[in-house]
């Protein structure tokens, strides 16, 4: 192993039986040149406690003779040697970021003041016999600061006489050029690359504080009254500004303050009385404003026909639930001669949007929020304005079990609707009434089918309001069957009505009868409700021209897949559905029950 006086330094490893290294391999270390280092002398009082011999004494029994330098070399240059085992320096090497090479001698950058007259550098020779394979696997030069070494080992190598305190890794760079500066720079760049991402992660972990948004004041809220001094300031500011146009606000404030101090008590009382009167007015206005805030209900409706909702709600009787039905119908080709819809029509070809805002203070605990159910374009709301306008107390907002049953059945039927619009609403109801055949046994049986085929224009259902409960259904068959069939309803509760749409006659000749329900609401109800199913099969040559199924409309139907080619326009579909629904609601509100005669 030759170091001094040579341009190239070679380090031979003689460790026995290492799995990676052999005794013949040599490692080339970079040359530090032939420069000589001059260390300026530092005059300090000698202290026997600062001797290195005490530290060396602790490690005499652990040292390796092979690692000790030549005596002549030590005598000539005054080098103090400190032999330390690898077990003590392993932790230091790892924590300072450097890795030991094979047989590397670690030279301290900073000198240590000792009681000797010369200022010798301290060299640490690491014995290679106890090296572990993990450290031998690396061959990277490492420069260790003396202050870091002493702090990691817990050894006071120089006591309090260490020249430089522990600094951050970036402060170890010397401003003056030195032979070891290039190695140190490389180590510091590696250190920066390792520590830079950690600092970024720490900065990103901090969540920025979101500024609190100030609540906007209501412009309708009454303003607080001014104090007596503010009133005086407002009156005198204009006069002072007129005399001194260039006066600043601070100067004007000082002048007004001096004038207020010199003002008499009686004049101050005038301003104070004004303030008291303004405060009373403010309290009254504030109480009125809060009362309006509690009782105000803002209802904004974006619709094609805004006054349609109150007009429809005014027609429904008081006991029935307030239900607004808006149907979304796609546009189809309509006849130019179609009648214009009345002002009571709610639905339009475009879907309406309803926005209802109800303050929580008005509603009771059970109705803290307005219930809005939407399914297939049907919106059901109970706004508070309608209930209060009818004179109903808020305690009656809870619907009766009958109203809940009606609303629930209507919503269930709407949810079970196919995407295609079915105009007759009576076909969307559940629980069809059971029909019993009262004719003789030789007559064919009647079967109810739920899915209606294309409907014929000659078959009608006439429904009129009635006060007594009896309900009779008469079926007049075609001329092939001379005897009429009388079928009466067995179901006593008319919660949901389903009109049969087709009949199958298994007897010869087989024939299917199709019924088109058309509801005609009469103004004067007769004493009983008669529903007649008139099924006639005229000759094909005499079949009249088809018409719109809505009552009172004589226009021919328009081909549209959304209403089975039965209506002439969107308005007829809406009016037909509305009339049928209103007739059903009025029947339910009167508590009519079907009985069998």
UniProtKB/Swiss-Prot annotation:
What is known about what this protein does?
Transcription factor that modulates cell fate reprogramming from the somatic state to the pluripotent and neuronal fate. Also acts as a regulatory component of protein phosphatase 1 (PP1) complexes. Component of the PNUTS-PP1 protein phosphatase complex, a PP1 complex that regulates RNA polymerase II transcription pause-release. PNUTS-PP1 also plays a role in the control of chromatin structure and cell cycle progression during the transition from mitosis into interphase.
Q: How does it assemble?
A: Component of the PNUTS-PP1 phosphatase complex.
Q: List the disulfide bonds.
A: none
The name of this protein is TOX high mobility group box family member 4-A
InterPro entries (UniProt xref): HMG_box_dom, HMG_box_dom_sf, TOX_HMG-box_domain
Q: Which GO terms describe its molecular function?
A: chromatin DNA binding
- Any one cellular component term from GO for this entry? nucleus
- Give the residue ranges of motif Nuclear localization signal: 212-217
Does the keyword field hold Mitochondrion? no
Annotated region (Disordered) at 160-187, 199-224, 522-547
**Biased amino acid composition, Basic residues:** 207-217
UniProt lists the gene as tox4-a
Q: Which GO terms describe its biological process?
A: positive regulation of transcription elongation by RNA polymerase II; regulation of transcription by RNA polymerase II; RNA polymerase II promoter clearance
Query: Which residues, if any, are the signal sequence?
Result: none
């Amino acid at each position: 192993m030759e170091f001094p006086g040579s341009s190239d330094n070679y380090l031979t490893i003689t460790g026995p039986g290492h799995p990676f290294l052999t005794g013949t391999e040599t490692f080339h270390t970079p040359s530090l040149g032939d420069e000589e280092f001059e260390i300026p002398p530092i005059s300090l009082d000698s202290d026997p406690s600062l001797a290195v011999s005490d530290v060396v004494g602790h490690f005499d029994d652990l040292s390796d003779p092979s690692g000790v330098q030549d005596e002549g070399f030590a005598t000539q240059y005054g080098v103090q040697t400190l032999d330390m085992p690898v077990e003590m320096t392993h932790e230091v090497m790892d924590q300072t970021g450097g890795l030991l090479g094979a047989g590397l001698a670690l030279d301290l950058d900073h000198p240590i003041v000792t009681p000797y007259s010369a200022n010798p550098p301290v060299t640490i020779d690491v014995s290679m016999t106890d090296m572990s394979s993990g450290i031998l696997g690396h061959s990277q030069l490492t420069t260790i600061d003396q202050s870091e070494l002493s702090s990691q080992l817990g050894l006071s190598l120089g006591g309090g006489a260490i020249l430089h305190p522990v600094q951050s890794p970036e402060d170890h760079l010397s401003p003056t050029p030195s032979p070891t500066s290039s190695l140190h720079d490389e180590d510091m760049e590696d250190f920066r690359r390792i520590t830079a991402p950690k600092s970024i992660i720490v900065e990103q972990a901090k969540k920025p504080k979101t500024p609190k948004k100030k609540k906007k004041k209501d412009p309708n809220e009454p303003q607080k009254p001014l104090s007596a001094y503010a009133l005086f300031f407002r009156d005198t500011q204009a006069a002072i500004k007129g005399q001194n146009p260039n006066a600043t606000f601070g100067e004007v404030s000082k002048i007004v303050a001096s004038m207020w101090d010199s003002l008499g008590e009686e004049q101050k009382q005038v301003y104070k009385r004004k303030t008291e009167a303004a405060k009373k007015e403010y309290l009254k206005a504030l109480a009125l404003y809060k009362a309006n805030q509690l009782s105000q209900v803002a209802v904004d409706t974006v619709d094609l026909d805004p006054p349609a909702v109150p007009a429809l709600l005014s027609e429904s009787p008081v006991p029935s639930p307030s239900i607004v039905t808006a149907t979304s119908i796609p546009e189809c080709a309509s006849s130019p001669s179609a009648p214009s819809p009345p002002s009571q029509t709610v639905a339009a070809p475009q879907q309406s949007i309803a926005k209802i805002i109800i303050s929580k203070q008005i509603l009771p605990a059970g109705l803290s929020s307005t219930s809005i159910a939407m399914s297939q374009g049907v919106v059901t709301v109970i706004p508070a304005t309608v209930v209060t306008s009818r004179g109903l107390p808020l305690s009656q907002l809870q619907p009766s079990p009958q109203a809940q049953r009606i609303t629930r059945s209507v919503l269930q039927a709407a949810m079970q609707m196919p995407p295609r619009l079915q105009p007759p609403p009576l076909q969307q109801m559940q629980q069809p009434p059971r029909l019993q055949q009262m004719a003789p046994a030789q007559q064919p049986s009647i079967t109810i089918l739920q899915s209606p085929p294309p409907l014929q224009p000659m078959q009608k259902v006439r429904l009129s309001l009635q006060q007594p409960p009896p309900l009779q259904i008469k079926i007049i068959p075609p001329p092939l069957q001379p005897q009429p069939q009388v079928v009466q309803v067995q179901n006593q509760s008319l919660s949901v009505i389903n009109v049969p749409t087709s009949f199958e006659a298994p007897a010869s000749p087989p024939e299917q009868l199709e019924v088109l329900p058309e509801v005609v609401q009469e103004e004067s109800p007769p004493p009983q409700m008669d529903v007649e199913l008139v099924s006639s099969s005229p000759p094909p040559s005499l079949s009249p021209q088809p018409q719109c199924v809505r009552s009172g409309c004589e226009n021919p139907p328009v081909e549209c897949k959304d209403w089975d080619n039965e209506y002439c326009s969107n308005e007829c579909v809406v009016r037909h559905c509305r009339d049928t629904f209103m007739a059903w609601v009025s029947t339910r509100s009167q508590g009519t029950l079907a009985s069998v005669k």
